Amino acid sequence: SHKAFKMPKWIEYYLLFFAHIAMFGPAITWVANHREHHKYVDTEKDPHSPHYRGWLMAYAGQVLIDIDFKLVRDLLKDNLHRMQVKYYWHVVFVYAAILFSINPMLLIYAWLVPAGFAKLIGSLVFTYSHRGKKANSDTWVGIITLGEGFHDKHHVNARTALWHPLDLGGQLIRMIDSNAKIQ
C-alpha cells in the first residue's frame, strides 16, 4: 500500500489469494483504507479508528465501508485486483463450502478462528497503538502481535520494513527481497 517495493506478479497473486481467504477484504479496499488511514490518523476521517468509529470498524472496517477508488488507481490497472473486488464474496463462500464439505470443523478451526484472530490482532494494534493524533509503540502489543504493535515506526517511515526483530511483515519482505529480487 506504500509502494515501497515491487515484487514479481506471481508472488503478489499468491499473497493476494491468502489475504482473500483470510477475509481481509479485497486488496484494493484494504490498500485504500490503509492509505486513507495514513492521511487521517486517528481523526474522524480515519476509516478504521476505534476512537472515532468504534471497535467494530477497527476489527472489520475493510469490508464494511465504501472506499475512494482514486486512492488505488495503481491497483485498478490490474485485472486480478479488479476481479477480486467483483467476486470477493463468491470466492469466500466457495472456499467456505469446500472446507465444510471436507469436514465442518475445518471451517471453524482452520479458517474462521485463524481469520478472526488475525483481525483481532489488527484491531488491537489500532486500539492500543494509537493515542491522540500520534501512533505509539506498545511493547506488550508488539510482543503479542509479533511486531504489529511497533506502530509509531511505521508512521514515521511507512516505506521501511523491519522495525523490530519481531516484525514478521518486515521479515517476510526481507525474505521476498532476497529470494525474488524485488526491484
Tell where the protein language model's regions lie, with residue ranges.
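Non-catalytic, topology-defining segments of multipass membrane proteins
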Residues: 1-124, 128, 160-183
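Active-site-proximal inter-transmembrane loops
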Residues: 132-157
